[in-house]
Curated annotation (Swiss-Prot):
EC code(s) of this entry: 4.3.3.6, 3.5.1.2
GO BP terms, alphabetized: glutamine catabolic process; pyridoxal phosphate biosynthetic process; pyridoxine metabolic process
Coiled coil: none
Originating organism: Staphylococcus haemolyticus (strain JCSC1435)
The reaction(s) this protein catalyses: aldehydo-D-ribose 5-phosphate + D-glyceraldehyde 3-phosphate + L-glutamine = pyridoxal 5'-phosphate + L-glutamate + phosphate + 3 H2O + H(+); L-glutamine + H2O = L-glutamate + NH4(+)
UniProt keyword Oxidoreductase present: no
Family per similarity comment: Belongs to the glutaminase PdxT/SNO family.
Domain of life: Bacteria
Known role: Catalyzes the hydrolysis of glutamine to glutamate and ammonia as part of the biosynthesis of pyridoxal 5'-phosphate. The resulting ammonia molecule is channeled to the active site of PdxS.
Subunit structure: In the presence of PdxS, forms a dodecamer of heterodimers. Only shows activity in the heterodimer.
Keywords: Glutamine amidotransferase, Hydrolase, Lyase, Pyridoxal phosphate
Protein name: Pyridoxal 5'-phosphate synthase subunit PdxT
Entry's Gene Ontology cellular component terms: cytosol; glutaminase complex
SUPFAM superfamilies per UniProt: Class I glutamine amidotransferase-like
């Protein structure tokens, strides 16, 4: 299968590496027309306001809102997928969740944690960099993992969202899960 990584910002190469380790073709998506050539899409981390502006500029928002393409959002990608973001309206509104930005603190408060992610494994390394958390989930959203009392991974239909950066580790099981369970 062909899995795209939105290549407007973020750790694009690292995501493509995880896709390839999962046995699939990874494609850096730079043009909206490329969305028709892929089976699933990863929205990487970075800065969510910048990501939204670039998606608007290059025409990705409208195309993705109308699409039923499976999408995996990490960190800023999770924020972009959310129906609501505390203090503002959501963007793509694919996941029926409310996200709180930077809820683990500033850049200096970044951390790593071993996560038990339902359906994947009990020992997934999560890298949290100015990470959001999921403050609320609506019916139909399955919680996959938490850090303390904060939700950090969810799925709903063809959509997977995580607060952390799985691509910054050598463990590609979260990407493999997305491909196996959402893209198929």
């Amino acid at each position: 299968m062909k899995i795209g990584v939105l290549a407007l910002q973020g750790a694009v190469r690292e995501h493509i590496r995880h896709i390839e380790l999962s046995g699939h073709e990874g494609i850096a998506v730079k043009k909206v027309e490329q969305l028709d050539e892929i089976d699933g899409l990863i929205l990487p981390g970075g800065e969510s306001t910048t990501l939204r502006r670039l998606m608007d500029l290059y025409g990705f928002k409208e195309k993705l809102q109308q699409s039923d393409l499976p999408i995996f959002g990490t960190c800023a990608g999770l924020i972009v997928l959310a129906k609501d973001v505390e203090g503002e309206t959501g963007y793509l509104k694919k996941l029926d969740i409310t996200v709180e930005r930077n809820s683990f603190g500033r850049q200096v408060d970044s951390f790593e944690a071993e996560l038990d992610i339902k359906g994947i494994a009990e020992d997934i390394e999560g890298v949290f960099i100015r990470a959001p958390h999921i403050a609320n989930v609506e019916e139909g959203v399955e919680i996959l993992s938490t850090v303390g009392d904060k939700i950090v991974a969810v799925k709903q239909g063809k959509y997977l969202g995580v607060s952390f950066h799985p691509e910054l580790t050598d463990d590609y099981r979260v990407t493999q899960y997305f491909i196996d369970h959402m893209v198929k």
